[in-house]
Structure formats: C-alpha cells, structure tokens
C-alpha cells in the first residue's frame, strides 16, 4: 500500500534545506519523523537494512519488509547500506542527534566486517549473492560510502582517522584502472562496474551517473580535509 525505500533517506537533505531557506520548520519536522520511523523499522539487529518497508496506509502498521533490488529479502544489498550510511550521516549533520550517527556507523561496520567484503573494498552488488566471488561489484555503493566516511571523519567520533583511512582505500581502488575508465571510453563516464538492479535485469555491470557523482563529491571532500 505504501512502500518506503531506504533510498528516501537521501532526499531528506532537501527538506532540511527547505527549512533553512523558508524559515518554516514543517520541512525539518517531516525529515526527522521520516528518519525516526526508518530508524525503527528498516534495520536488522546486526545493523544492515531492508530495501523496502511497506506500510498500511490507514494505520501506519508494517505490512511487509523486503529487498527488491537485492538478492533476497534478508540479504545485504550493498547500495541500500550505502544509502543508509550516507542518509543518516546527513541527519546527524542537520540535527546533531547522536542516534543518527550511531546508526550510520553501525551499518558501516556491518559492511566493513562482512566476510565477503573484497580486499579492494568495492562491494559485491549484494553481500549475500549466491555466486561470490563471481558476482558483479557495485562501484556506486563504494563511492557513496567513501563520501559519507569523509564527512564522518570530521565529527567527534572515536577513531575518526580510521574512517578517513578506509575511505582512502576505497578511493584508491576506484581510481585504479580496474574501475576508472580511460578517457573517452565508457560512454564518457568516470567509473565502470556499477549495478542498478540484477533482479530486474537492469543496469548490470555498467557506468551509473550517481556512482560518478559520489566519486567526485568524495574527491572534493578528501581535498577539503587537507585545507
């Protein structure tokens, strides 16, 4: 009836900005309410998240939890984890409520410690996909996570330098010939090897514009850290 995707966390930045620009706190309150409900319903005990939570539109109860673009409902779809890490980092930035940063870190640590995380730190499209290591990687998840980690490293968190160092390792991999396309190739996209949705047979092992976006954002954030 009312499916809500973890991707929506990325849109809350617009609502926070709308309050700043308009002076109307309604947008801020909507963003916080959305983040809080997502916090309570989208996450598993280990910190990983579902892709979709379907709500009953009449009473707000949960009808179903699933992972539409991942391997299975209970699997760890990599880009969903990236949206969660980045989105809750946004919420911490805008509210300074520590619970949001704690969730971002918990989800990141779940990804970092996944036994299937490759040595180059570019995740498989789903960390529970059945044919690992012969599964497509997802550079878009990696670039989004790296960008979020650079922001996290600027906050008063224990071992902040380790988040920066982990992001550096991701970016080193993405900038290598394994993932960064030669000039004039790859449809003029920067990064190769992203995945849209394997269950929908859509955008498999291709360049994606948002992979490039977060790669460029991460590069800028990394440069800003040296100022």
Spans of features found by a protein language model:
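Glycan-recognition and catalytic cores of secretory/periplasmic carbohydrate-active enzymes
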Residues: 1-227
């Amino acid at each position: 009836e009312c499916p809500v995707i973890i991707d929506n966390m990325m849109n809350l930045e617009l609502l926070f900005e709308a309050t700043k620009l308009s002076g109307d706190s309604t947008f801020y309150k909507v963003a916080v309410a959305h983040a809080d409900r997502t916090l309570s319903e989208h996450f598993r005990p280990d910190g990983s998240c579902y892709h979709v939570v379907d709500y009953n539109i009449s009473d707000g109860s949960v009808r179903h939890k699933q992972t539409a673009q991942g391997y299975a409902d209970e699997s760890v779809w990599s880009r969903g984890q990236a949206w969660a890490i980045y989105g809750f980092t946004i919420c911490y930035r805008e509210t300074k409520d520590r619970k949001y940063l704690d969730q971002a870190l918990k989800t990141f640590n779940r990804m970092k410690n996944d036994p299937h995380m490759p040595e180059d730190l570019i995740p498989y499209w789903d960390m529970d996909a059945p044919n690992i290591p012969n599964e497509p990687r997802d550079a878009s998840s990696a670039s989004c996570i790296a960008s979020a980690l650079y922001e996290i490293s600027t906050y008063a968190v224990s071992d902040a330098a380790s988040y920066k160092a982990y992001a550096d390792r991701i970016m080193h991999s993405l900038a290598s010939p394994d993932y960064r396309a030669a000039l004039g190739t790859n449809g003029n996209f920067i990064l190769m090897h992203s995945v849209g949705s394997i269950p929908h047979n859509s955008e498999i092992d291709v360049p994606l514009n948002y992979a490039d976006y977060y790669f460029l954002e991460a590069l800028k954030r990394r440069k800003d850290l040296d100022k």
